[in-house]
Amino acid sequence: LKTQAPWLILGATMLGNGGVFCWYSYISPLLTQVSGFSAESLTVLMVLAGFGMVAGNLISGRLSDKYMPGRVAAIAQGMICVALLLVFFLAQISWLNVLLMCLCTAGLFAVSSPQQVLLIRYSKGGEMLGAASVQVAFNLGNAIGAYCGGLPLEVGLGYKYPALIGSGFA
């Protein structure tokens, strides 16, 4: 961790995760109050979000083996940014919001594998510390994202606004 590269990767990891968790921390009220889903349907919707996570992880792992991990991470992060912007503008269309939810969760887990590969690659002599540090970056992103996603709600803006804040992080 003596060079700049691992720190840039850790920062990108934190911001990328933060962007998703700005939005995902408030997904239940977004789905019920904006998209019109019932509270009873949330279990099924969260299972769909989980399928997105699994698919994103599997796909990006294979892509990171075949292509440059930095490119895979950048494309996944770009997909998250666009999907979060679309959530902000189109969340009232229920089926589209579910599709965007799956894209965002796929992107969250798609970006993780290549970032971990990059961090270990650029942490020569400190691979174990790099691998441990990436978990810290994920968790910091989660906490900071949830906090920042709640800020527009604190001032009375609607449940679509955490997605807008998240797109800025992404």
Show which residues each predicted segment covers:
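Extracytoplasmic gate region of multi-pass secondary transporters
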Residues: 5-47, 51
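Small-residue (Gly/Pro/Ala) motifs that create kinks and tight helix-helix packing interfaces
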Residues: 28, 60, 144-153
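Juxtamembrane helix-start elements in MFS-like secondary transporters
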Residues: 37-46, 93, 97, 127-131
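Short hydrophobic/small-residue motifs within alpha-helical transmembrane segments
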Residues: 50-51, 139-141
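Helix-to-loop junctions at the C-terminal end of transmembrane segments
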Residues: 56-69, 153-154
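C-terminal transmembrane helical hairpin of 12-TM major facilitator-type secondary transporters
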Residues: 70-115
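Paired intracellular helix-loop junctions of major facilitator superfamily
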Residues: 118-128
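A membrane-interface helix-boundary motif in multi-pass transporters
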Residues: 151-170
